[in-house]
Amino acid sequence: MSKFTTEEIRSKFISYFKANNHTHVSSSPLIPHNDPSLMFVNSGMVQFKNVFTGQEKRPYDKAVTSQKSLRAGGKHNDLENVGYTARHHTFFEMLGNFSFGDYFKEQAIYYAWNLLTKEFELPKDKLYATVYHTDDEAASYWKKIAGFSDDRIIRIKTNDNFWSMGDLGPCGPCSEIFYDHGEQIYGGLPGTKDEDGDRFIEIWNMVFMQYEQINKDTRIDLPKKSIDTGMGLERMTAVLQHVNNNYDIDLFQEIISFTENILKVKVEAEAKFSYRVIADHLRACSFLIADGVVPSSEGRGYVLRRIMRRAMRHAHILGSKEPLMYKLLPKLVDLMGNTYPELKRAESFISSILEQEEIRFKTTLERGLKLLSEETENLNAGGRLSGEVAFKLYDTYGFPLDLTEDILKNRNIAVDHQGFEQQMLEQKECARKSWLGSGESKTDQLWFDIKAKYGSTEFLGYNLNEADGKIVALIKDNALVNDISEIDTQFLLIANQTPFYGESGGQMGDIGVIKTQNCEIEVIDTLKYLGFIIVHKCVLKKGKVITDENANFSIDVKYRQNLRIHHSATHLLHAVLHQILGKHVTQKGSLVATSYLRFDISHPKALTPEEIVLIEDKVNEIIRDNHEVDTTLMSTEDAVKQGAMALFGEKYDSEVRVVKMGETSLELCGGTHVRHTGDIGCFKITSESAIAAGIRRIEAVCGEFVIKLIREKEGLLKNIENSLKTNKNELVSKVNNILERNKELEKELEKTYLASLDLSVEQIEKQAEKIKEIKLIYCHVENLDNKILRQAAENLTKKVEDLVVVYVGNNSSKLSITVGISRAITDKFNAGFIAKELSLFLGGSGGGGQPSIAQAGGSDLAKLPKVKDQLQSLLDA
């Protein structure tokens, strides 16, 4: 049996099926498109789901893929096992071949057997097959093609060997291929009591999609039978590299060795588990970020954060004091970047996000671990950490629940899940109630029924501002009605065709008027449901509207033109950002309104003023060049080949609309645009800010709204001139003079404040409270700067050798603590310790400084009267 590299195995699998007339389909992103049932793509068939159900047609009937997959949330959550078992991963690659109504069982089994035994040269006596217990047909093909005797074909009665897409829909029996790693390894054949051992490992699963489940009692034959197969690349590589643990294959070993060279800790004993966790999680984090996910406190972003923080905690175990993950990224890009070029394109962005998140977490990791250690100090094996503490670790220190569980795993201490969930529910109750009342759902069954009955709405608005159409449906209070007669009532209207653009792709929907012989309707918004149905949000102004009557649809042309202007400007902005900031920039969201545009991008840091000017200048240059805006229909494949930018995670039909603006912008888009770039007029960025880690938001205005902005700025400038009694030529000089005078006054005020706090030696002796062998001056002050309080404390402690000075300041509902200690007694009392303890007492997070001077903060004003008692107890200790 030959030994292959991971890359060779992937390539050989794809080449084999391409040679057998399969179309090589690239891996889809890890984020499923329009599939709320899945958080992440977890198998090769996900991107073909609608093909199997007949909802989508592809220009091929056989396919081969190497699909990026991830299991770390929901039903498929392998996170807690990753690194500790031989085959659990968060990120993995699933090799697969698929047939959509072409070949079936016999050919699928032949392809698999031929590839394994001839191309990969696996010994035939090492292979076994399972079939569903009633699938005599598959068993007969295994006998015919592989020459298997009955004892090599294992019949399985459970649903492990029968697959279904859901309660209803396509389904069918499975056949799995198992490899025998040898009797030196514990484990039994599938179906035996020892089947969970590591000796017999499933390497390929074939699903024979031959039935459709109509209801719980009825299953019929599908008119076109299909094949869905999956082979885990990491498992297959372990077999072909003669190892029994996936983490021992070349790809993981290279990452682990690279990490070991950085950390200088040997890969042995308990450390090997941490190295495996880091290697696995590096892949998951990097591919998630490359596919557009960034760390956040909810949804996919929170799963990413959980994975990242678990890896960071294991880096901490290995003694890493500095951010580590981003240092490993170049090795991963070197290993996998050619196969998945998105890694190369987004490398700088991934690196920045990894580093930022690790820096952020390291600030709380130590404190969280300290709290966990204190809370479990008296817990023995079999004990349980309270849900309240687990929630505090989550809420205050950023510890995901499964990270806390992972830390306690080796000590056999459990976590009170119920208590944790109760704390979580209490915190989220208000948000949950708000969410439950959030409007109409675009996925209500009503809309599926409407689509099935009336089909898609034809959009006429690319070329027409006004058109006739037929009203096919009226909806009021989430129900279909035949007519609407109450004046000023709101309702939804659907037509067979319309020039109104339904909100999608970031572009707001049109407004306008609909008229029939019997009524006049104001359209206050236009939406798009299910991607196909254009829905007019209406108010009846006159008469009575009835279904099935003809109507005239007329958009507000001025409103639409401003939408066109800002939408086209968004395309130019996107293209220019690529030029100036880099190819890692991807669109994370947008809003095209009539008076402004908003554009969210993946970028690790704030744009500099110089970058903003460069972006504005380049966009305006393209506008002035007055390029023609061309729109062309072409295949998605041709569009991508020509370099058209597509929105991340967006799914496109086989034929797409491509919008081209000069040689700068080429983008897939279904929105409405200007005829020439000059129609935009001009472009001005109004703000740039962060909305999440690694996500920047740019807002801008175009055309007449730039003129409006200039006039507003001029008006503001004039008001300032009038207030300062100057003109624009002398304004800067006047402001600088005022600022200089302010600085002088602040210095004088600072001296005054310091003088008010200063005490002579005699005054100190008289006012200080004596505690044992030291003197204490404690003072509560209002609205004084921390710098002044620090200087005052230092001044006093230099005058007397046995003095402790504590100022507690109250400034805008925030508390500050300043502790000064004479150097002669810092061997007995530490200013940093006292400041930290007082901060914690006042609801702060601690603080610190030098033994002789330290500052910290607090927030609990109610405890102010008890601060002195707390201080005295610290000094008495």
Curated annotation (Swiss-Prot):
Concerning SUPFAM superfamilies, the annotation shows: Class II aaRS and biotin synthetases, Putative anticodon-binding domain of alanyl-tRNA synthetase (AlaRS), ThrRS/AlaRS common domain, Translation proteins
> Recorded E.C. number(s)?
6.1.1.7
> Which cofactor is recorded for it?
Zn(2+)
Report the main location listed first in the record. Answer: cytoplasm
Per UniProt, the enzyme's principal EC class comes to: ligase
Keyword Nucleotide-binding: yes or no?
yes
Q: Does the keyword Nucleotide-binding apply?
A: yes
Superkingdom, taxonomy of origin: Bacteria
Task: Write out the annotated subcellular location.
Answer: Cytoplasm
Mention any one GO cellular component term assigned to this protein in its UniProt record: cytosol
UniProt xrefs under Pfam families: DHHA1, tRNA-synt_2c, tRNA_SAD
**Binding positions for Zn(2+) per the UniProt entry:** 567, 571, 669, 673
Q: Which GO terms describe its molecular function?
A: alanine-tRNA ligase activity; aminoacyl-tRNA deacylase activity; ATP binding; tRNA binding; zinc ion binding
What are the alphabetically sorted keywords of the record? Aminoacyl-tRNA synthetase, ATP-binding, Cytoplasm, Ligase, Metal-binding, Nucleotide-binding, Protein biosynthesis, RNA-binding, tRNA-binding, Zinc
User: What's a BP term from Gene Ontology annotated to this protein?
Assistant: negative regulation of DNA-templated transcription
Q: Relay the cofactor remark from the entry.
A: Binds 1 zinc ion per subunit.
Write out the catalysed reaction. Answer: tRNA(Ala) + L-alanine + ATP = L-alanyl-tRNA(Ala) + AMP + diphosphate
The UniProt comment on domains reads:
Consists of three domains; the N-terminal catalytic domain, the editing domain and the C-terminal C-Ala domain. The editing domain removes incorrectly charged amino acids, while the C-Ala domain, along with tRNA(Ala), serves as a bridge to cooperatively bring together the editing and aminoacylation centers thus stimulating deacylation of misacylated tRNAs.
This chain's function reads: Catalyzes the attachment of alanine to tRNA(Ala) in a two-step reaction: alanine is first activated by ATP to form Ala-AMP and then transferred to the acceptor end of tRNA(Ala). Also edits incorrectly charged Ser-tRNA(Ala) and Gly-tRNA(Ala) via its editing domain.
Q: Which family does the UniProt entry place this protein in?
A: Belongs to the class-II aminoacyl-tRNA synthetase family.
What is this protein's record name? Alanine--tRNA ligase
